[in-house]
Amino acid sequence: MEHIKLTLAIPKMEKHEIEELESWIDSMCRYRLEDLGFDLVLRKYKHKESVLFFRYDKVYYSERIDRKMLFPSDRKAGLLVCIEIWMKMTELCKRAFGYRTEWHAFALNQLGMTLMYDNQSTRALQCFLESLDIRKYLWGENELTAVEYNNIGCAYDAIGEWMVGNTYLMKALEIRKSKLGDHEDTAESYCNIANNLMNMQRNNEALIYARKSIAIRNRIGDNFKIAYSLNNLALIYNNLDEKGRAKSLLDKAIRILNGFGWTESMEILTMKVNRNHIYGQSLDT
């Protein structure tokens, strides 16, 4: 994809506001935007309205943004900022590049992911389904459509439609095993299927998939994701009433995550909730 400069222009932007907004964008938006081919730049703007805009093929594309949303006071507000940005990005990409383009499909997928972080699973599902339709049209069944099958499965899982979710998750796994072999994406599929089966109280089956996820991540050396798989395995053992094994796995996962120092990541926050639920302890203990 061509690299394009994307500008988020805000009037009367103070230094501390720039730093605050940069922090939220870095955590939820910037790296995904870079994957899409955009270089995000913040700058002051002479007009009254805040806008997100870029130039493509000698034409300017812009979307207005409510300035009040851009300076979050907490994590929830920060997510709303990033949701707003990705909503604007989907419109910009559709107008600039066309509906059935990878630009638009990617932006839809990222909007869906951000909505999932905000527990808006039904809205996220619609984004993933639309992105899947575009990517199947463009690429057929490949790694990109597998991403959407996986995300659709997770969204259905989140809204409690576990059997439907399982169908999509299995489809993603089938493609990833065929196209990628032992790969992080394949490990992710095994991990997500384990979660899905656990939600349906099929814990012995979930155990098989969780172990396969860990085996791949051990082989490729993805320590951070190994911790996430260990966390899931601990939850399964807890459901099987093997508290000792569950505690040992959680302790190991926590040690790995503490080594990264990512105390505010979504993964660590999730693990804190899990440990509090099972053992009544915080992640730091």
Residue ranges and their predicted role:
Residues 8-81:
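N-terminal alpha-helical interaction modules that lie
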Residues 99, 140, 181, 221, ...:
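Structural signature of alpha-solenoid helical repeat scaffolds
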Residues 71-74, 102-117, 144-158, 184-199, ...:
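Conserved alpha-helical positions within TPR/SEL1-like repeat arrays
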Residues 244-261:
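TPR/TPR-like (Sel1-like) alpha-helical repeat modules
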